[in-house]
Amino acid sequence: MFTGIIEDLGVVVSLEREATNLHLTVQSRLASALKIDQSVSHNGVCLTVVDCNAASYTVTAIKETLDKTNLNSLTEGAIVNLERGLKLGDRLDGHMVQGHIDQIGTCVGIQSQNGSWTYNFEYDPTLGNITIEKGSVTVNGVSLTVVYSKNNGFSVAIIPYTYKHTNFKPINLLAYQPTNLLNYLLTY
C-alpha cells in the first residue's frame, strides 16, 4: 500500500530482459535504506526489490505487469517516481494507493495556469468513466485530485512543488508518453 506522495525521482540505469521478464536497476537515494523483499512503487507500479546496494537496487517486472503499465516503454536514463511501501502508523498524506495499475493513459494536453499547470489525460473509452470530479486519481504514482472528469479522460492540476519533485516535468506532450493510471479504491 502506498500514499501517492513521491519520495524520490529514480534514474533507470539498467534494463535487462530475461525471457518475458524485465529487470530494472534504479539509482536512487532511497537505495541505501532498502532491503530485499521490500515493495517500492515505480510510476505507481508496485515492484519487489530483488537486489540492492548503497546506490541502486533492482526490481523485476513480469509480462502481465509490462502489458498493463508503462514500464515496457522505459529506457536507460528514464526518470521514475518512487515511493516506499506504507508502514502501519505512517501518515496518509495522499490517498490509499494499491500499486495495481488500472490502465495506461495518454497526456493529450498541458495548459499553463500562471504558476501551475493543468494536465489532460485520455484513456480507453470502453472502460467508461473511471474518475469523479474532486475525487482522487493516481498518475504515474502521484496522488492527485481530479479537476474535470469525462467518459474517456480527466484533468488534474499540478502545483509547482509537484511539478519540480515528480516526473510530470519531463512528460512531453508531443511524444504522447504513456502514463500509468490508478483510480481511487473508494471510487469502485
Where are these regions (language model features)?
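Conserved loop->alpha-helix
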Residues: M1-Y188
